[in-house]
Amino acid sequence: SLLELGKMILQETGKMPSKSYGAYGCNCGVLGR
């Protein structure tokens, strides 16, 4: 879900998902696995 993805991005980058989501949005599958 978006919430889980946001939490993962927040933990990985340590920044707000809103800013990093654009960059990691395409690579969410790679980070998810």
Curated annotation (Swiss-Prot):
GO CC, alphabetical:
extracellular region
The chain's coiled-coil residues are none
Main location (coarse class): secreted
Task: Kindly indicate whether the keyword Secreted belongs to this entry.
Answer: yes
Which GO molecular function, any one, fits this protein according to its record?
phospholipase A2 activity
Where does the record say this protein resides?
Secreted
Q: Which UniProt keywords apply?
A: Antibiotic, Antimicrobial, Disulfide bond, Myotoxin, Secreted, Toxin
**Can you say what this protein is called?**
Phospholipase A2 homolog BmarPLA2
What does the record give as the organism's lineage? Answer: Eukaryota, Metazoa, Chordata, Craniata, Vertebrata
